[in-house]
């Protein structure tokens, strides 16, 4: 993989990781349209490190408060940050278990273009329904362990390619009564442990490889981190004004394009 390919793929990962449009749907397109080779495990780890760095940097103050609140809750001092930290932990469990139990099956059987096209469209329509019907009756401070578990179960569905982790968690939060901004904020905070687990798992597998292109890795980390940070900032700035409809329309067009690849291949 040359540097131009690395920049392009890292840019795709950085932008699509946090927008509700599915990163896997976009990463499969260069392979199908241009015949590009698979980016490889090392590059996957690199872009995970990049996107993780971006979300940690953006929410650094929140993370410090969440950690302090969590430690405080252990010593018996209750706080909103402590409760939210426990909610994030609980919401992470379903996806972790789902990945351990079904990760290999999904990799072997559900990474086809037809599956990604279907999930891109179906979950895009579900996002539209949730956004149209959301009532904004809850704030993030009202998050409970049960609600977090439901959102976590939704996040587990994102193991299926094309679903979009941010898309399905925002959808679930909207359906449960949260506003767009709070739904997106919780989704992004929830991404931190799940990206850490996923990147850590791939990192362990990477130890078995001997041929690693460090230039590609550097490009992957840097480009994905910068693009992801910018994406998070503008998404949170404009989501209450523009809503989810632009992303729904985009998903429908993308799904149609993927179906066209299947039908005319």
From Swiss-Prot:
GO terms for molecular function: undecaprenyl-diphosphatase activity. The chain crosses the membrane at residues 1-21, 39-59, 86-106, 112-132, 140-160, 186-206, 219-239, 244-264. InterPro entries: UppP. The keyword tRNA-binding does not apply. Keywords: Antibiotic resistance, Cell inner membrane, Cell membrane, Cell shape, Cell wall biogenesis/degradation, Hydrolase, Membrane, Peptidoglycan synthesis, Transmembrane, Transmembrane helix. It is found in: Cell inner membrane. It catalyses: di-trans,octa-cis-undecaprenyl diphosphate + H2O = di-trans,octa-cis-undecaprenyl phosphate + phosphate + H(+). Its main location: membrane. Bacitracin is thought to be involved in the inhibition of peptidoglycan synthesis by sequestering undecaprenyl diphosphate, thereby reducing the pool of lipid carrier available. This is Undecaprenyl-diphosphatase.
């Amino acid at each position: 993989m040359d540097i131009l390919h690395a920049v392009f793929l890292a840019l795709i990962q950085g932008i699509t990781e946090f927008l509700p449009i599915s990163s896997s749907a976009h990463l499969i397109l260069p392979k199908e349209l241009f015949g590009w080779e698979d980016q490889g495990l090392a590059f996957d780890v690199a872009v995970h490190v990049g996107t993780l760095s971006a979300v940690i940097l953006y929410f650094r103050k929140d993370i410090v408060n969440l950690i302090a609140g969590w430690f405080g809750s252990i010593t018996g001092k209750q706080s909103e940050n402590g409760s939210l930290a426990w909610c994030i932990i609980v919401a992470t469990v379903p996806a972790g278990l789902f990945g351990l139990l079904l990760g290999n099956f999904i990799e072997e059987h559900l990474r086809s273009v037809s599956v990604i096209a279907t999930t891109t469209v179906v979950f895009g329509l579900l996002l539209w329904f949730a956004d149209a019907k959301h009532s904004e009756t809850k704030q993030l401070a009202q998050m409970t362990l049960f609600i977090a578990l439901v959102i976590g179960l939704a996040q587990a569905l994102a193991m299926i390619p094309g679903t979009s982790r941010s898309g399905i968690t925002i959808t679930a939060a909207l359906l449960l009564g949260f506003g767009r901004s709070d739904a997106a904020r919780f989704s992004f905070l929830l991404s931190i442990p799940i990206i850490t687990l996923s990147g850590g798992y791939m990192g362990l597998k990477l130890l078995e490889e001997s041929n690693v292109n460090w230039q590609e890795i550097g490009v992957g980390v840097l480009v994905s981190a910068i693009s992801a940070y910018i994406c998070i900032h503008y998404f949170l700035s404009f989501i209450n004004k523009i809503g989810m409809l632009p992303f729904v329309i985009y998903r429908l067009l993308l799904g149609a394009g993927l179906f066209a690849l299947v039908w005319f291949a």
